Amino acid sequence: LSYGPVDLAGFRNWLAQRYQSVDALNRAWGNVFWSMQYGNFDEVELPNLTVTEANPAHWLDFYRFTSQMVAEFNQLQVDILRELSPGRDIIHNFMGRILDFDHYDVGAQLDVSSWDSYPLGFLDQMRDLFPEDHRLQFARSGDPDFQAFHHDLYRATSNGRWWVMEQQPGPVNWAPNNIAPRDGMIALWALEAFAHGAEAVSYFRWRQLPFAQEQMHAGLLRSDRSHAEAFAEAGAVAEMIRNIDWPATTKGDVALIFDYESAWAWRIQPQGEHFDYFSLVFDIYRGLRRFCLSVDMMSPAVA
């Protein structure tokens, strides 16, 4: 997040449009508490430098504002691309467990949503989500549900069309421990994505770099253009899916709402040290999968 003067001016303007009057803002935020009433919108500061704890409503509106700015910037680029390259699908890639903006708003502007799937990197990196014994158990295969959760979530953001934009092909360079996948996992991860409705699975990288920041990040080819371990598995999947009669997309057994504003509210004022909205919904998702139920993620706006 940015907290500069341009952000402050934009936030004040956004509040003025949202509430129309400062009295309406004071009522909505409950500013009578601690005598926090504003006389005009120019008195509102950003929530990061308040003398004491900021009003939770102040923070929540700031998150709403910054999320809308992300969506507006994306829309600006979408409009340019649609004008200069009409008739083509527009796609953008999201990430795992990123809650800083409402992905439904951005996804609605796209033809195809996608995300970057790094099963081993995410497992070892997200240590607050995965305890040590769990990380050791799945160190070379990735958490059994994390990828599926995001497949279903991002499928919901752009009316069912989605890709894996970056699929892990081997050890990465950015996790605490960059472990090689177990034999067969490259193929399994791709097949899992297709089973969740992916139109495409794209690997990052095609060829490993011999220099710079990501030179230790594996590709389907090594830097000398020889085949890395993942090359054969990716090729096998390509042959496999040519001969699979994929069923028509159907509704899941269960709908599960994922709400970004709820995630922000939990972050702003958690009622326990380890309260985390993502973890709550993820645990529910895990439980549904244990009962062999397919899950459709939904925005609260369409629930």
What do the PLM-derived regions correspond to, one by one?
Residues 38-44, 118-121, 132, 136-303:
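Carbohydrate-binding surfaces of carbohydrate-active enzymes
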